[in-house]
UniProtKB/Swiss-Prot annotation:
Residues 22-42 dip into the membrane without crossing it. Residues 76-102, 188-213 are cytoplasmic. Catalyzes the three sequential steps of the methylation pathway of phosphatidylcholine biosynthesis, the SAM-dependent methylation of phosphatidylethanolamine (PE) to phosphatidylmonomethylethanolamine (PMME), PMME to phosphatidyldimethylethanolamine (PDME), and PDME to phosphatidylcholine (PC). It is an enzyme of class 2 (transferase). It is a multi-pass membrane protein. Disulfide bonds: none annotated. Belongs to the class VI-like SAM-binding methyltransferase superfamily. PEMT/PEM2 methyltransferase family. The gene is pemtA. The chain crosses the membrane at residues 55-75, 103-123, 167-187. It holds the Pfam family PEMT. GO terms for molecular function: phosphatidyl-N-methylethanolamine N-methyltransferase activity; phosphatidylethanolamine N-methyltransferase activity. It comes from Dictyostelium discoideum (Social amoeba). This is Phosphatidylethanolamine N-methyltransferase A. The lineage of its organism: Eukaryota, Amoebozoa, Evosea, Eumycetozoa, Dictyostelia.
Amino acid sequence: MIVEHAIDYIDYLMNYVDFTEKYFLLTIACVVFNPTWWNITARMEYKTKFMTKICGSKENGCYLLAFLIFSLGILRDWLFSEALIRQPIFQEFDRFEVEVLSYILYGFGGILVLAAYLKLGITGTYLGDYFGILMKERVTGFPFNVMNNPMYNGSVMLFIAHALSYKSVAGLVLSFVVYVVYKFALIFEESFTNYIYSTAAANAAKKNKSKSK
């Protein structure tokens, strides 16, 4: 009975989502494309150093990638906002509690993203390890002592907050798409990052061993 009611309510909510609207579809495309592109590009850089060669140094290569990722993020956020404007308004979200929740998510999500960026810096945030710019030690301070992947989690919170402030069920659907895509991206990013650091540690151990002979 509970499951049936839940399914019926989801069906009811979906009446407030225009799945054929252009900006809605473009937002999904951009959300999927962005991490797919930066993971492929970063792995190509790790294997071929093509951005390092083009830019003259690994730092400049990382800054270029950071600029491109940031620019794609702005495009994604703009498409998201444009999509919400064109979607039906869900009047049940026109409540004080929902407004307060959106403010809380804006605040906490923004703090997570900003604090993570300040801890990691440009190269730590934008895949500097793929360029050979490795962190000397694991970052353990706030917000990394609160949760794993605070930047991704904070970003999802900001999307949800924006959806609630626009009283948009479609915005929540898009936020869920962002969450799922980030989870998939992390599967590839975390495993390859571990590979980068384990390879670097093994190479360092070999050098130390050869020096001691």
